[in-house]
Structures are given as C-alpha cells and as structure tokens.
C-alpha cells in the first residue's frame, strides 16, 4: 500500500486541530451527530467502528488524553501524538508514505489504475482510495482535487460550501451584533427547515460576538444547517434559570432595560435594548406593561430573528459541507457504484459531523470500512 500526499508536512489538519491538541473523537458520537443529503448513509460505518475502537487504539499507544466537555476527547500533550500513532500503525502495516508529491494524472487502464507523478515514475494499483479531505483551510493545502477527480469518474457532487464557520452580519438594523466583540452568551439557536436541504437543528451552546458577526460553538454548529437567505432564531433566555424568571413579584419593579442588564453582559444588554426599543417601551417597569406586550417581549427574546449576510469562507471554516454524493457509493464499503476499484472516504464525501470530534470519527469509521472491504478482496 502506498499513500500519496502533496503536502510538505504530513497530517497538517490533524496537527492544527483542537488548538494543537486534536479533538480526535467524541465518546458519544453517533448517527445523530452527522448530516448528509442522504440521511442514514453514514450509519453502517459508524456502527462498525465506534469511538471506543479508536479510544482503544489511542490507549494502546499510551497516549494520555482527557474529556473537555460533551464527550470531546483531546490529547493531553499535543496533536503530534495522534500523528505519531497513525505513522506507527502505517509502519506496522508496511504502508509506504510518499510526500510531497504532485499527481500529474490518474488514468483507469484495463485491470488497474496508473498514477503519474510529476518528475517521478508512475505507479499502478488495483484499488484506488481517495481520502483528500475537503476545501476548508486552503492555507494548509486543502483543495478541490478529490471532488474534481470524483466528478471526472462520473460521480455526482452535491454543492459544497464552508461548514462549522462563523457568520457575518452587514445590514444596518443588525449592526449592533458587530459592536460588542468578545462578548459571549450561552444561547439556543434554531436553524434550517425540516424536510428541506440538510434539515433543521437546534443547538444550546455559547455564542461569541465578533467584529464581523457571530462565532462560538452554537453558531458554528448552526452554520452547517444554514442556507443563504435564511434567518436563524436565537433564544437568548435558554440558559438562564427558568424558575421565577418572569415572576412579577420578583421583576415587576424593574424596567425592561434593567432586566436585560441583570440577565446579560452589559454590552449585549445594550444591543438587545437597542433592537427591542424600536418596537417596545423598554424604559417602563415590567409591572406597567400589559399582558400582550409582555408576551410579545418574551416571545421576541425566545425566538430572536437574525439574518446573516453570509459566512466567513473557507479560511475560517473547520470542515466542508457537501461533497461526493453518497448515492453513488456503497455505505458498507465506501466503494464507488461506478467503478468497483474506486473508494472515497472521509470529508470528501457528503457526510459532515457536528463540532466536537465527530468529523474525525467519520474519518476513522469510513477508512475502517474501506480497509476491511479491500482486505477481504486480498484474503487467500
């Protein structure tokens, strides 16, 4: 087996992931943590190679790790431990890794593939695996090569765009969002539309205000489901203690502005007051407001509509959404239905995980199923 990589540094995306500590899996990862235009495609692979399988491999290499939160597992030392693990396993399996190399052409011949390398001899193989990743973070060499090659082999490509990416806001009526960089608030964000595109989802996580818009885990998660032109719905109250939150005996003497300042960071309270003040008498005491106005205010805070202008693109994205259409692949082997000698795995396929180690788990699981299928063909 030969691995060809155009990068000067091997496994660079692993190296930079998780702030340099590699969120190598999520111990709670399962089918519900993935999206695809072909829902359920990833289920088989995810059941065949579970987080506990990779955790066992990590432990066998005596790599210390810890859970950060919500099942996310990180190396105690650095991402280099995971890279070292993969290189050691490759050596054990007599895998040759050649990099940096430039692929000039890949041609299907009668019984094999011929891979021409710029300035080097060509290679031939009976099975070809495309594990090129997506287009996120082009600075480390990400490109559309895998997509272009798959298309050239007759496979359909679902539209791709940046995923797990911050959102931008440019309209004047939402300018307040960009005027409080650094402010963070735990919120619930609802996004998408059931039965359309990648469906609908809701995430209760932190949102971070930036000078361009919104970031933070809740926003990155929501970005996977968001479509251009859609609004997102923010529940600003979701993480607050709900008992007696609107008990008039407790809050009746306070104005809406004062309540906002009590519930939220000062700059966020000011921004919300600016937006709400266009429609409601926010300087009046809560007890002085009529029932209908109170209900409208509560509803507005629980389903606050924001319409992103866009996202911050591939340079700021963590993953690619979309990719090789899974209807052209066998879910048990990741084998192309157009050519039984071609396999496509990992991020190049239209399977995208949630934030928190799930995309690595898809990489491990899809690679495992592919490897088992190829191994079975070579069994005596």
Model segments located where?
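Short hydrophobic core segments
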Residues: 2-4, 103, 122-142, 150-151, ...
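An anion/pyrophosphate-binding glycine-rich loop and adjacent beta-alpha core
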Residues: 8-10, 15-16, 25-31, 64, ...
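Glycine-rich active-site loop/strand segments that organize a redox cofactor
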Residues: 19-69
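Short beta-strand to alpha-helix junction loop
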Residues: 42-50, 69-88, 98, 137-142, ...
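A conserved beta-strand/loop element that lines the FAD pocket in flavoprotein oxidoreductases
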Residues: 91-103, 156
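A glycine-rich dinucleotide-binding beta-alpha-beta segment and adjacent secondary-structure elements
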Residues: 99, 274-352
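A conserved short coil-to-beta-strand element within the FAD-binding core of flavoproteins
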Residues: 99-113, 165
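A conserved FAD-binding loop/helix module that cradles the flavin
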Residues: 134-153, 351-380
């Amino acid at each position: 087996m030969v691995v060809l990589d155009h990068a000067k540094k091997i496994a660079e995306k692993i190296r930079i992931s998780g702030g340099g500590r590699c969120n190598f899996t999520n111990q709670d990862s399962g089918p519900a943590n993935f999206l695809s235009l072909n829902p359920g495609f990833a289920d088989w692979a995810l059941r065949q190679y579970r987080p506990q399988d990779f955790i066992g491999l990590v432990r066998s290499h005596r790599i210390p790790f810890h859970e950060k939160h919500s099942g996310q597992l990180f190396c105690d030392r650095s991402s280099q431990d995971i890279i070292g693990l993969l290189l050691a396993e490759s050596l054990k399996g007599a895998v040759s890794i050649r990099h940096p190399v430039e692929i000039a052409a890949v041609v299907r011949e009668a019984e094999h593939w011929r891979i021409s390398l710029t300035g080097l001899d060509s290679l031939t193989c009976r099975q070809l695996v495309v594990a090129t990743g997506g287009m996120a973070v082009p600075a480390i060499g990400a490109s559309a090569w895998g997509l272009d090659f798959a298309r050239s082999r007759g496979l359909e490509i679902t539209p791709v765009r940046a995923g797990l990416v911050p959102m931008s806001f440019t309209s004047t009526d939402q300018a307040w969002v960009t005027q409080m960089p650094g402010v963070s608030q735990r919120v619930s964000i609802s996004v998408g539309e059931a039965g359309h595109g990648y469906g609908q989802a809701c995430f209760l996580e932190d949102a971070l205000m930036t000078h361009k818009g919104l970031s933070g885990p809740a926003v990155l998660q929501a970005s996977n489901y968001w479509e251009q032109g859609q609004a997102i719905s923010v529940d600003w109250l979701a993480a607050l203690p709900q008992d007696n939150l609107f008990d008039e005996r407790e809050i009746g003497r306070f104005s809406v502005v004062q309540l906002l300042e009590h519930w939220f960071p000062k700059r966020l309270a000011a921004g919300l007051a600016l937006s709400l003040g266009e429609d409601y008498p926010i300087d009046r005491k809560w007890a002085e407001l009529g029932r209908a106005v109170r209900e409208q205010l509560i509803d507005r805070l629980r389903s606050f509509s924001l319409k992103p202008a866009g996202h911050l693109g591939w340079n700021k994205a963590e993953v690619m959404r979309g990719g090789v259409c899974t209807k052209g692949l066998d879910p048990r082997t990741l084998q192309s239905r157009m050519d039984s000698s071609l396999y496509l795995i990992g991020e190049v396929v239209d399977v995208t995980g949630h934030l928190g180690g799930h995309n690595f788990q898809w990489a491990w699981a899809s690679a495992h199923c592919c490897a088992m299928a190829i191994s079975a063909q070579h069994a005596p």
